[in-house]
Amino acid sequence: MDYNVKDFGALGDGVSDDTAAIQAAIDAAHAAGGGTVYLPAGEYRVSGGEEPSDGCLTIKSNVHIVGAGMGETVIKMVDGWTQNVTGMVRSAYGEETSNFGMSDLTLDGNRDNLSAKVDGWFNGYIPGQDGADRDVTLERVEIREMSGYGFDPHEQTINLTIRDSVAHDNSLDGFVADYQVGGVFENNVSYNNDRHGFNIVTSTNDFVLSNNVAYGNGGAGLVVQRGSYDLPHPYDILIDGGAYYDNALEGVQLKMAHDVTLQNAEIYGNGLYGVRVYGAQDVQILDNQIHDNSQNGAYAEVLLQSYDDTAGVSGNFYVTTGTWLEGNVISGSANSTYGIQERADGTDYSSLYANSIDGVQTGAVRLYGANSTVSSQSGSGQQATLEGSAGNDALSGTEAHETLLGQAGDDRLNGDAGNDILDGGAGRDNLTGGAGADTFRFSARTDSYRTDSASFNDLITDFDADEDSIDLSALGFTGLGDGYNGTLLLKTNAEGTRTYLKSYEADAQGRRFEIALDGNFTGLFNDNNLLFDAAPATGTEGSDNLLGTDAGETLLGYGGNDTLNGGAGDDILVGGAGRDSLTGGAGADVFRFDALSDSQRNYTTGDNQADRILDFDPTLDRIDVSALGFTGLGNGRNGTLAVVLNSAGDRTDLKSYDTDANGYSFELSLAGNYQGQLSAEQFVFATSQGGQMTIIEGTDGNDTLQGTEANERLLGLDGRDNLNGGAGDDILDGGAGRDTLTGGTGADTFLFSTRTDSYRTDSASFNDLITDFDPTQDRIDLSGLGFSGFGNGYDGTLLLQVNAAGTRTYLKSFEADANGQRFEIALDGDFSGQLDSGNVIFEPAVFNAKDFGALGDGASDDRPAIQAAIDAAYAAGGGTVYLPAGEYRVSPTGEPGDGCLMLKDGVYLAGDGIGETVIKLIDGSDQKITGMVRSAYGEETSNFGMSDLTLDGNRDNTSGKVDGWFNGYIPGQDGADRNVTIERVEIREMSGYGFDPHEQTINLTIRDSVAHDNGLDGFVADYLVDSVFENNVAYNNDRHGFNIVTSTYDFVMTNNVAYGNGGAGLTIQRGSEDLAQPTDILIDGGAYYDNALEGVLFKMTNNVTLQNAEIYGNGSSGVRLYGTEDVQILDNQIHDNSQNGTYPEVLLQAFDDSQVTGELYETLNTRIEGNLIDASDNANYAVRERDDGSDYTTLVDNDISGGQVASVQLSGAHSSLSGGTVEVPQGTDGNDVLVGSDANDQLYGGAGDDRLDGGAGDDLLDGGAGRDDLTGGTGADTFVFAARTDSYRTDAGVFNDLILDFDASEDRIDLSALGFSGFGDGYNGTLLVQLSSAGTRTYLKSYEEDLEGRRFEVALDGDHTGDLSAANVVFADDGSAAVASSDPAATQLEVVGSSGTQTDQLA
């Protein structure tokens, strides 16, 4: 029941104190057994009670407070309040409150107008007492301007949820979780709070934080910690997703906590560490993006350290142990010291696997723990591996989860605490698991055995049947039994103190498997602790990497985008939810799907969660879809799966076209071409339960097959068979031989696969007999036999004939094969006038447009006649409409969306060739036409197309925008056109687009076609999926040659050519609306030349590859990347562009989309490799990356030359150049980032504040004027200063250069041009060597000023006071001045800085 507070006297006028009225409504709801207290929009002022714990409003069991929305309904503290308030809204102190909460409103603490500590929300039971608040829900709540905490669920609460809520501008933490059990924070935002964004403290456990965001807070973004009292630490905490950025301290701090997982989050821009693990145990940090932290000083991106609480409340020293870091991408800021740093304070047992680390200043990883490890490979699931030798070893574990491998010898293994795996290997081993759930693994029968005369069995000393397990899955035993036939006998000794698992089957050496366990385990073994089959390798709800072994096993990925590899053995792979990558490996593997959502796709939203099988072997492997209800292969409808080969021919998709309520349908991809190789043998389909179909198969003999009430497929094969489908909608295929076919009840299909399945000769009959054909629901499928329809039995037709008695109907061909066999089937009964294309399926026919009245004389309007032929083909179930050579004039039919000619399912237009068959718009047409030839608006059309003809828009003699070809389903609706093929078609003289497949089309192919002299683009691909443009030409179109836009993905362009177009040759772009970007595009081969703008323009798109193309002679840039991500430009020839102005050959820049999305799209992660790039005389650069946020560009092994300003300019802090050749450019005066290669490079920064990085090789770095950062990289590098004003300071400011990695043993600083004579006191032409007070930076300083007050100074990172000498600093009088002008011929690469002025002249 709802209780409106205004009915209780609340005013919500922002002035009156409404506390009493709202509380009265709460009390009334509680008295009635519960209800909703509703606060309409308004500002409700409230005041506190006598004690802080009285709060303002006390909520009670079964009561929920609901407003009209955040910012609409506001509960605000009265002005001038002076007493602390522990929760403006709170549960009652000392009472257990349950099933209560708050939603859709704002709490405002009004902290600027009061003088007390006020918290927003508070609930929880008395600390240390037996009791708890339960089932608390807060949704869509904003808490702001508190002088205390925002959300403060405090002490002993079970099952609290806070979601979709916001805390900001509060004096302490935004969100607190204090002693919360089984709760969740989901999709919340915490910003601009004076302390932490989220603070998880004091015994909180079994708690989940999912997709929360914290930024701009005065403390950390997220803290999980014990707190200031000696209480149990937080544990079993999962932090999944979300972002923690721009906070003053850490992004995430885990302090005195254990068993915490942080995964799938982005953590960046924080003042100190990105992640700090501080006296915590068993922390997992998985698959996060951690970057650009350490904004307020020099810190590691991830720090692992112990916490000294010996002088604190516990008196303990908390060592950080068992930290697991895997799959993280870590990139440092300019201040970041290490990617991952372990302090030398006892921190140990850190395990680092497959992390990507770059951009840090000191080193990627620094580990001090004796047992800490780092690997580039993925982890195995255990936190460490202890391995013995071939001798007698004693291995002892720790509190971590470890794998102990004894190898050969009589070993003693002790796992200690943790969930350990113990594998003694060969020899007689003594195995002690210790505390935790341990697994005793046996990898070979000879690891533990006895003979008739001696025992060599292993002894397990402390097996716990409740939590330990014995893994025998590699040994081939089937279970417990009598010790024979692959079983094991369980036997105890006479005293009952020892248990044996024994096999009595000996090998050739008389060895029979046996293990011993201390204790009596009779009746205690079960499937959970005695594993005969391999235990499943299980993932998590995150993105996991599971790798099998040589044994047969089951891999369960669960949620996330998992990678499963079965290895050898006959494995079962179950990816679970998410987009998974599945590799069976060697053996006969089964890929199993347990839910439709395990592998699904939504063509409306573009969400692709389809799994990929990478190594399917149709001779061994199988795909199990039995749990999904699929009954067989088919057309993708009604419980079948369609087999669809993609346009490139390198991927086979299994697709259902039946969507769920959210628009998702099942889809699965197999790498490779499996057309013709897939049948029911490769699948496990649904059983016959619940109306689903199964297969009943005969032999080569005379079979009787009987169906059931289910939908079944009966295959008679050879022989004289009798098939009866029974009930259900069945498919009956008798195969060869004279068969009798009875469908039974239901809508049955009688399928004939070859003409010899049912035939007669001149002397005998071998025809099949259908005994119970029902023309109203049954069908005869002859689609594969080549018959076009009913007729006289000749010319590919069948004669319908009834016997004289009227008791039998025949379908007969009189055309015999070489053996005199002519097709014939018989039906019991007289079906005269009852058989047609609705119940007999023929092969699509050819419909000549001239038979319908078309003239093709270039004058008559042939539209009605051609449309009649199309309609006839459609009515016949599909066919080809043939237009002989001629010019067919057509007119519009009505609305723009009606076009001229409307194609339908299964219908293809075909002519006699380009220029021979011409469909041309009539003179004088003044109507807009969205497709002269098109599919129907609002209908899903499939299996249609056009070939061997020309469409002519006649634009000189018409008005109105006219497009050539158009197809596609309604944008944003659930549906799509499918399987569209256009071949050898010319489209010309349109006032609009040429080819315009527009919105939601799956599997379209346009090949060997031409578009020219059209008013807009030649070819458009708008929301195309799994489609291809191949061997097409677009020229002289007024806009772009090819335009790929709006959500198009999984798209291939092969060997297309675009020239002479008024825009770009090829554009791939999002378009003008805020829609999904095109993605997963491959452009392979072809040429793009002599276009007015770019040769190729990529704009607001991602995951595009451009390779093996030639791009030249275009008006602006050859290739322009404009707000893109993850683009590859590989092995192209790009030359002689920039014909209409001054542009780079290849330009990378950000796109300002403030007018549509409000976003700035930076160009990121571009790879340019193996290209020949030769700038024209007009080009200012061969390759230029704008200084606009574009970054992470990688140039590898290119041949680059030319450029008026420079050959290469890279402005991104993480961009790099290596390999190949780059012509020597001219220097300029901007703020540059110059990166050398592995060769011996010369880097000249010019003026500006530059960043120079020599990379590998013996490099020369000259920053020039400006305050420069100089990194030599590996090799013997020389830092050259050509003028005293290149690096200096004044009394007012510092403009010195900084050398970041000076190595006194091989690098040199060349000051020979400056006139200094050596080291000294900084006067009389000497330089003083001075160390900073922190001991972290060394300066070379002169105290002698020039006329402008500038005195030379250079800074070096680190303490070099003891290693600078004449051997590594070159002064004017030491005879080594020649170093500054080393022979350029010996230098393989020179990179010169660039101007900050944009000279590209691009719109």
Swiss-Prot record:
Pathway field: Glycan biosynthesis; alginate biosynthesis
Cofactor: Ca(2+)
Domain of life: Bacteria
Regulation affecting activity: Inhibited by zinc.
PbH1 repeats: 133-155, 157-179, 180-202, 204-226, 257-279, 280-302, 320-359, 977-999, 1001-1023, 1024-1046, 1048-1070, 1101-1123, 1124-1146, 1163-1185, 1190-1212
GO cellular component, one term: extracellular region
Disordered: annotated span: 372-395, 408-428
Hemolysin-type calcium-binding repeats: 388-403, 406-422, 424-440, 557-573, 574-591, 697-712, 716-732, 734-750, 1227-1243, 1244-1261, 1263-1279
EC number: 5.1.3.37
Enzyme class at the top of the EC tree: isomerase
SUPFAM superfamilies (alphabetical): beta-Roll, Pectin lyase-like
Subcellular location, record wording: Secreted
Keyword annotations: Alginate biosynthesis, Calcium, Isomerase, Repeat, Secreted
Protein name according to UniProt: Mannuronan C5-epimerase AlgE1
Organism field: Azotobacter vinelandii
Organism classification: Bacteria, Pseudomonadati, Pseudomonadota, Gammaproteobacteria, Pseudomonadales
